From Swiss-Prot:
Domain CoA carboxyltransferase N-terminal as annotated: residue spans: 23-279
GO cellular component terms, A-Z: acetyl-CoA carboxylase complex
InterPro entries: AcCoA_carboxyl_beta (IPR034733), Acetyl_CoA_COase_Trfase_b_su (IPR000438), ClpP/crotonase-like_dom_sf (IPR029045), COA_CT_N (IPR011762), Znf-ACC (IPR041010)
UniProt name for this protein: Acetyl-coenzyme A carboxylase carboxyl transferase subunit beta
Gene name as annotated: accD
Record pathway: Lipid metabolism; malonyl-CoA biosynthesis; malonyl-CoA from acetyl-CoA: step 1/1
The family this protein is said to belong to: Belongs to the AccD/PCCB family.
Amino acid sequence: MAWFKRVKPSIRPTDKRDMPEGLWWKCEECGAMLHKKQFEDHFFTCAECGHHFRISPYKYFSILFDDDKYVEFDDHLRSADPLGFVDTKKYPDRVHDTIEKSGKTEACRNAHGESGGRPLVVSAMDFGFIGGSMGSVVGEKIARAVDKSLELDAPLLVISQSGGARMMEGAFSLMQMAKTAARLTRLSERKLPFVSLMTDPTMGGISASFAMLGDINISEPKALIGFAGPRVIRDTIKRDLPEGFQRAEFLLEQGFLDRVIHRRDLKNELVTLFSMLKV
């Protein structure tokens, strides 16, 4: 039995309102809560610690091209199933399900436009599509991006974001390493710059082929870059790895990279570079 009777009602809770989806983001590195506008204003990086989130090719296009104006090309290409590959599901079913779930058509997108008033061709990979893995379509798109650069007499920027070759296509996937590397020689013959931007992650057959062949090799901060992952290497050699091993800053110290560039400075750095090269 209660001894006291509440005379006045307590504070009445207001109607619960649903928070718009995607209004807040949590930093994967430091745990800070980031408001959507703040997140976008900082080019999808953490305002507290500078962590770079993975972003889609379209967001890179918006950052790089003047007034967000560009022309996408070769988006009609789709993966075939040359091996009839099956693991937990058939390869065509996996591709179809990924397209349905993500709304993306492949792990690479090509576009051309102007950056700083100068023509530029960009081929950007997407980790959100089967880990950004390189199969026949990705290799063909990068090769066609080279052809577009030759056609427009414009420099080429390739943005890598991939776990490596696409195992479901076997040797057809590995062939893309040689194919892309060979096609890039045409840019050298025409004296057109090829800039390779490595983002997190750039691994496996990507790092072992076109990603490391740039006239200028640059990276976003703390990007994981290598062939086998650090855990695999550690378990194989049974030794601890150096601090920061396979991270962008470590590779810069070892001479594998020319610059590590924050995403907010990417466009200005590229515009300055291309103006110095007069292309």
